[in-house]
Amino acid sequence: IVIHLTAPIRRPGAVMTITFVDFYLNRAHIEGTKVLSNLSENGNIKFTVQVTGGKVTFPNGRGYKYDGIKYVKQIQGGNTRPIRDDAYSIEGRSKTEFNGGLVVNLNTESPLIKKVVCPWISNGVLKIKINSRVLFLDYGAPNNGNCDNKAMLTWNNGNNQRLITLP
């Protein structure tokens, strides 16, 4: 693994590039580049994480390719000392292509909200596309963004819904 830092990562404007070179974990070959960019401003945390050319190949030849980008922005608590009032907005998209032809695309339809005091995402909608099938996962349902481990999974153009329990 090669890591290149332009400055200490906590400094606004810093960029950390992680490149996997001839790297194996539990005999799986891991490739690609991960770039973390610190875009923080005015005391609020803001950063991106981008993976390009991600690829995992298992000893049996199976595996997948992955590309994605995530934007994280502090939306509450930046002006206070305790972290318990902090909350973050997460947006992004990714594409995973499995060797067998399955393609999974994830895209935030509305920002995912993660409060520090809550172990689950409390609001936001994630679009999940598996080949041609489209699903939506609404983290705000059924309690309008309150902290709970429930989310509404919708598919078939909204004709089917199921309230699911998150781990």
Q: Model segments located where?
A:
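Generic structural detector for well-ordered beta-strands
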Residues: 2-4, 19, 107, 127, ...
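Short N-terminal edge-element motif at the start of the domain
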Residues: 2-40
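Short linear motifs in intrinsically disordered
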Residues: 3-9, 78-85, 114-118, 137-145
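Short, hydrophobic/aromatic-rich segments at coil-to-beta transitions
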Residues: 10-21, 44-52, 87-92, 120-125, ...
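Hydrophobic lipid-interacting interfaces of membrane-associated proteins
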Residues: 21-30, 52-59, 95-102, 131-135, ...
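Short helix-loop boundary/capping segments
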Residues: 35-116
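Outer membrane beta-barrel transmembrane domains
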Residues: 107-131
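A cross-kingdom marker for long, charged
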Residues: 127-167
